[in-house]
């Protein structure tokens, strides 16, 4: 049954009716995870339909509901349906009795399928009237973009719809060369140049037609608010509406609804007009349709325009912060034009009320009461995790906004007499401080540098504790933002943290007080800290106070326990939950001192080391058993006569086969224990010999863990990348994700770059990428140093000057900072030292920073090998820059392009300047800055349109949805397909309910599920999920993120599998264009993509084009892997086939011979690849002349050969860091990825369309019912048929 809660489809302006932030369903869609919720097994909630009776047209609607939905979810469905979204203030009745909004439908008396409930309009309150106005403005398209401190320009942008529709690229910047495929091209790859320059227009929003205007304006009236005596009569607000006909109406918002009043701009008379103009209605939407004849038609056109977009592209963010693009349209573009909107300054009042108290929340109490919610049943867990996810999202949003204000100096400190770094702030019930050593806490650890690192580590520690979710242990809400060079920490206020204790009492109840001099202990903390330490592999250990007294602690001495005045046990300062990386410091003899002593091992490394040691333990146990068994058998044989011994040995052999293996596999690991002491090497002094011996053992274990990182983890990563066993990183972000996944700290970039250099040319791309990332990170540290004490008005001047010194030296070797001197005078205490920076000084500073922080020496000519655009992007993402789009000139030859760019200097082009006729709508674009007569530079301050905060949060992931996903995967691996798919759908629904639709975790799940469905040969479901993965990835991680590229590539693969090859090529082209921007040409993983493109072109019988793409792939492969590699031979094999199909038989023979020779040398004559190449070579050689004349006829006569190397099948793109073992399921599900099990005959039929693809199976409609989360899409999500 298809679920759409009625007969009309959703409006695009409103949330999906199963809005994850409002729905409180226990188990989604009535499906239960296997093995869970047995207590509800008999209830089987299911879906059923009810009728809602309305007071106005259409008078009745049908709504699909579930027993376990709450009544407020039904309300939300009604509010979001196009026929009923004018209702906001109402209640529901059943059998004449009012239904409580917060009960489940199963608790409503006598409510059965097809029952009728009645919608009854309620009187408005002042708050409901304000919310009604905000909602109606959004519905009718009258609200402009909100400007705030957190969401930047084009936040949450998605390009998928524009790419899929083949829309023209933005004209905000001129193309360097018009090489894009036009609408008449045979396919999307026509004109694409593999080594060509990056086109920045690829990541800009396409030009959009303006939306239909429904009203000219709708706002609060100048007569608002009502005077006291009229408030007593029920007047709530006064509004002013100007219709498209040009008529202005003054409207009174009354407790009973809305009516047109008799006010004018100069006369106050807020009472209803006389008939026949006495328009009134309960809903403002209805009233506007009464006073404006054109409203209904224009509103319908607006809905139609919105319905053309995918719902996910317009869906509002609920549980995550949208991604801010680093490159945005220039200020001259209509996309970023600032437009007049009288209601924009009124929105704070409309949303938060007169005194703003409606948005003030007790964050800490909300966090802790949410943690204390029951978690006994599945429904309890779902409700608890959904509330947790929403709460963290709200807190992160509020804390980030407050932190920006603190960083800009707009919040008064609580201690204004202290130094700037020591000041603390409270804003919106959140406690803020700077990530600097204002009071000398970290003086011995590295001062400000140590404090800055410690607060970031603390957030990671809080996140780890939140994920463990230990009952009885609480953490404050914690997040960190980096903004304008400052690091600001935001924490929820723990009750009692500011309380002055009695003399003799400590501020802290467990752990170190005032550094490590005094140790506090409280027995109530021991049980919960014991659980925490066990989960984090932390060893219980002694510490000593300043008097040498011994104290046994469960955690690091740096980790604090505080008993709040609310009676809860809080854990604070979680920056030292893993040991110090001692080998890093001991290795500093040959290097300059590291800036701080806060360099600890990552939790992922500790977990990896634990698994490694456990593996060793299991091997030793198995070896012991084998040895013991062998000795027992030998003794038994010795004690028996010869005849019996012979018989016994035969029996023993057979029994050994049956029993030994399972016994050896089962090893009890409960005796295996490994925990690390986080306080070794940090100044503790053991007192007795026994203590010293124990401490030495702890130190040895930590050294072994550090050595494991250096001697095993680092070389293994380099080897995996060398062998192509993991997806190759594309930019700084994907590189750091890869390192962190393996437990490698970013400080090891230098060590990794040195190891990559030793591997030679094959890892040259990795060395370049790591060098680029080190330069970007060093630049970030330097920029932060100059920005920290600089007035915010000069931030763009500082950044533009530093960028000119790094990236613009070929345009101007002696750039000068552009500063408004008159503005400088009003900031006498500002630090303007950035003006003194020169390209030479900056280069030396970067080299120094890299040497200190990464222990790596750059080549003398490193500046000449910079990839300017990619480095600019990395720097922008690290500093939160949003740059105006233009063709940035990185050398003098590019200046011409820049000069003619509309965004470069702001002047009109000759064509524009020559026209005297005023263009329609030109008054809406923002004015352009006047051209500066200053010398040419690459960057000017006006290029930096915005700076957004970089947020680090402590939000935990959903354990429940991950468990369901893992259970589904295991079931599929065990060939329990139906159960596996059921659990996976369960996980999908849980993800969407808990995180909301727009969240990075949901994007990752869509990506994973699309691959699972593709492997299960459910191609339509794979396409639908891959499309969703693309959109959600773009909006939450960035339109040019590495994840977005992978999502586009997999979507192209799935589209091709369903027969939409031309669409697939559109996606491939877009992904390749993105690749050029974030990495440049010739990325190692692009070989797979180019091969896939070539195969798709063969599928379309475009053999010459296919041949070109194989040749391009071969060029990249030879450059990366060398001429004599198996990879190169594989592509030569494919290219030979392509050449044969392109009727170039001589070249085909030569390429196949090259492939054969490489296979022979590298793999030997008996290898399958060698034999297949030999077989093909014989056939091609014998039939060279005939193939050239008629390839199909000749090949149809060829005998069937053994399996052929692939090379004509498309392959999925591995995710960055994904190992081949992680893709093993794909190989099992689809056969060996490197082999194509078809004969030459079949290959020819495949290439020429004889076996294009399996017909698309029609999916059962019930699939939509199983996942109503996806009901809002234009097409119902296709699920696998069972």
Curated annotation (Swiss-Prot):
This is Clustered mitochondria protein homolog. The gene is CLU1. GO terms for biological process: intracellular distribution of mitochondria; mitochondrion organization. May associate with the eukaryotic translation initiation factor 3 (eIF-3) complex. It comes from Coccidioides immitis (strain RS) (Valley fever fungus). The keyword Transcription does not apply. Residues 1257-1272 have a biased composition (Basic residues). Residues 341-585 form the Clu domain. Residues 924-936 have a biased composition (Low complexity). Keywords: Cytoplasm, Repeat, TPR repeat. Residues 1212-1223, 1273-1282 have a biased composition (Polar residues). InterPro entries: CLU-central, CLU_dom, CLU_N, CLU_prot, GSKIP_dom_sf, TPR-like_helical_dom_sf, TPR_rpt. Belongs to the CLU family.
């Amino acid at each position: 049954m298809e679920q759409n809660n009625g007969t009309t489809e959703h409006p695009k302006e409103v949330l999906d009716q199963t809005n994850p932030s409002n729905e409180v369903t226990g188990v989604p869609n009535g499906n239960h995870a296997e093995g869970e919720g047995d207590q509800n097994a008999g209830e089987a909630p299911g879906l059923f339909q009810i009728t809602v009776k309305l007071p106005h047209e259409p008078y009745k609607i049908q709504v699909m509901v579930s027993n376990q939905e709450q009544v407020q979810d039904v309300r939300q469905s009604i509010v979001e349906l196009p026929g009923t979204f004018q209702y906001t203030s109402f209640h529901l009745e059943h059998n004449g009795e009012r239904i409580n909004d917060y009960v489940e439908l199963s608790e409503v008396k006598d409510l059965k399928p097809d029952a009728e409930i009645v919608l009854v309009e309620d009187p408005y309150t002042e708050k409901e009237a304000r919310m009604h106005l905000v909602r109606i403005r959004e519905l009718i398209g009258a609200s402009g973009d909100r400007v705030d401190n957190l969401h930047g320009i084009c936040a949450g942008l998605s390009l998928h719809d524009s790419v899929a529709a083949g829309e023209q690229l933005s004209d905000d910047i001129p193309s360097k060369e018009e090489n894009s495929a036009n609408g008449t091209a045979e396919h999307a790859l026509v004109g694409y140049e593999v080594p060509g320059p990056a086109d920045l227009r690829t990541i800009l929003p396409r030009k959009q037609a303006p939306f239909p205007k429904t009203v000219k304006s709708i706002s609060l009236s100048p007569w608002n608010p009502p005077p006291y005596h009229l408030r007593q009569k029920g007047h709530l607000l006064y509004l002013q509406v100007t219709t498209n006909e040009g008529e202005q109406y003054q409207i009174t918002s009354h407790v009973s609804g809305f009516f047109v009043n008799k006010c004018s701009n100069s006369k106050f008379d807020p009472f209803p007009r006389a008939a026949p103009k006495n328009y009134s209605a309960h809903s403002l939407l209805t009233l506007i349709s009464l006073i404006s004849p054109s409203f209904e038609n224009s509103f319908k056109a607006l809905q139609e325009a919105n319905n053309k977009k995918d719902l996910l592209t317009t869906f509002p963010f609920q549980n995550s912060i949208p991604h801010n693009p680093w490159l945005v349209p220039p200020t001259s573009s209509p996309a970023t034009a600032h437009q007049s909107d009288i209601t924009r300054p009124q929105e704070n009042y409309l949303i938060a009320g007169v005194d703003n108290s409606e948005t003030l929340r007790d964050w800490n109490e909300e966090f802790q009461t949410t943690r204390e919610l029951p978690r006994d049943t599945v429904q309890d867990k779902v409700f608890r995790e959904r509330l947790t996810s929403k709460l963290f999202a709200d807190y992160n949003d509020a804390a980030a906004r407050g932190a920006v204000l603190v960083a800009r100096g707009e919040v008064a400190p609580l201690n204004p007499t202290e130094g700037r770094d020591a000041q603390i702030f409270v804003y919106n019930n959140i406690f803020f401080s700077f990530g600097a050593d204002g009071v000398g806490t970290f003086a011995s650890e590295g001062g400000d540098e140590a404090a800055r690192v410690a607060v970031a580590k603390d957030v990671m520690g809080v996140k780890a504790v939140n994920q463990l979710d230990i009952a009885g242990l609480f953490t404050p809400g914690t997040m960190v933002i980096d903004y304008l060079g400052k690091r600001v920490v935001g924490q929820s206020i723990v009750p009692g943290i500011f309380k002055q204790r009695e003399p003799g009492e400590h501020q802290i109840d467990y752990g170190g007080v005032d550094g490590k001099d005094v140790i506090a202990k409280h027995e109530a903390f021991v049980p919960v800290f014991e659980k925490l330490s066990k989960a984090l592999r932390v060893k219980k250990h002694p510490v000593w106070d300043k008097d040498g007294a011994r104290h046994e602690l469960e955690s690091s001495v740096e980790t604090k326990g505080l008993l709040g005045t609310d009676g809860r046990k809080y854990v604070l300062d979680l920056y030292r939950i893993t040991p110090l990386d001692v080998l890093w410091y001991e290795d500093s003899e040959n290097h300059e001192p590291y800036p701080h002593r806060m360099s600890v091992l990552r939790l992922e490394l500790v977990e990896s080391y634990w698994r490694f040691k456990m593996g060793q333990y299991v091997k030793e146990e198995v070896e012991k058993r084998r040895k013991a068994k062998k000795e027992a058998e030998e003794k038994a044989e010795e004690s028996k006569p010869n005849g019996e011994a012979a018989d016994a040995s035969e029996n023993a052999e057979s029994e050994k086969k049956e029993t030994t293996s399972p016994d050896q596999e089962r090893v009890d690991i409960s005796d295996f224990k490994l925990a690390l002491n986080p306080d070794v090497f940090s100044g503790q002094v053991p007192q007795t010999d026994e203590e010293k011996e124990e401490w030495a053992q702890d130190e040895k274990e930590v050294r072994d863990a550090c050595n494991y990182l250096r001697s095993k983890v680092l070389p293994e990563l380099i080897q995996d990348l060398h062998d192509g066993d993991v997806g190759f990183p594309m930019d700084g972000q994907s590189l750091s994700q890869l390192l962190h996944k393996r437990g490698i700290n970013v400080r090891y970039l230098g060590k990794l770059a040195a190891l990559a250099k030793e591997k030679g040319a094959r890892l040259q791309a990795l060395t370049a990428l790591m060098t680029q990332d080190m330069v970007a990170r060093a630049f970030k540290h330097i920029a932060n140093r100059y920005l920290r004490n600089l007035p915010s008005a000069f931030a763009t001047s500082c950044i533009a000057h530093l960028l000119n010194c790094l990236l613009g030296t070929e345009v101007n070797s002696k750039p000068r900072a552009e500063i408004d001197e008159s503005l400088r005078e009003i900031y006498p205490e500002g630090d303007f030292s950035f003006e003194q920076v020169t390209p030479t000084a900056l280069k030396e500073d970067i080299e120094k920073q890299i040497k200190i922080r990464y222990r790596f020496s750059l080549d003398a000519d490193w500046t000449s090998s910079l990839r300017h655009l990619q480095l600019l992007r990395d720097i922008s993402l690290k500093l939160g820059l949003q740059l105006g789009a233009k063709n940035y000139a990185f050398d003098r030859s590019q200046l011409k392009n820049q000069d003619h760019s509309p965004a470069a200097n702001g002047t009109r082009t000759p064509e524009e300047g020559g026209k005297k006729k005023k263009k329609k709508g030109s008054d809406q674009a923002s004015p352009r800055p006047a051209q500066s007569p200053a010398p040419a530079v690459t960057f000017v301050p006006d290029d930096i349109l915005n700076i957004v905060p970089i947020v680090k949060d402590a939000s935990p992931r959903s354990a429940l949805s991950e468990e369901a996903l893992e259970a589904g995967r295991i079931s599929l691996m065990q060939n329990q397909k139906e159960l596996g798919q059921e659990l996976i759908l369960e996980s999908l629904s849980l993800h969407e309910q808990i995180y909301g639709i727009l969240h990075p975790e949901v994007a990752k799940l869509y990506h994973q599920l699309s691959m699972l469905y593709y492997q299960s040969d459910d191609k339509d479901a794979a396409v639908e999920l891959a499309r969703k993965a693309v959109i959600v990835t773009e909006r939450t991680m960035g339109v040019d993120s590495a994840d977005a590229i992978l999502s586009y590539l997999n979507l192209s693969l799935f589209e091709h599998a369903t027969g939409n090859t031309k669409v697939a090529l559109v996606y491939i082209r877009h992904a390749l264009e993105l690749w050029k921007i974030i990495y440049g040409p010739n990325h190692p993983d692009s070989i797979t993509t180019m091969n896939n493109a070539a195969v798709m072109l063969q599928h379309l019988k475009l053999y010459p084009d296919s041949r070109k793409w194989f040749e391009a792939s071969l060029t990249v492969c030879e450059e990366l892997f060398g001429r004599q590699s198996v990879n190169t031979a594989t592509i030569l094999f494919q290219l030979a086939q392509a050449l044969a199909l392109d009727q170039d038989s001589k070249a085909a023979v030569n390429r196949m011979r090259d492939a054969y020779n490489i296979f022979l040398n590298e793999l030997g004559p008996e290898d399958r690849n060698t034999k297949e190449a030999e077989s093909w070579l014989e056939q091609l050689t014998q039939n060279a002349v005939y193939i050239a004349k008629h390839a199909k006829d000749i090949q149809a006569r060829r005998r069937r050969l053994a399996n052929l190397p692939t090379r004509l099948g498309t392959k999925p793109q591995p995710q960055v860091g994904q190992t081949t073992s992680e893709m093993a399921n794909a190989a099992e599900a689809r056969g060996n990825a490197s082999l194509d099990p078809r004969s030459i005959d079949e290959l020819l039929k495949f290439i020429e369309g004889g076996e294009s693809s399996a017909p698309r199976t029609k999916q059962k409609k019930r699939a939509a019912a199983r996942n109503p989360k996806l009901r809002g899409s234009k097409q119902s999500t296709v699920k696998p048929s069972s």
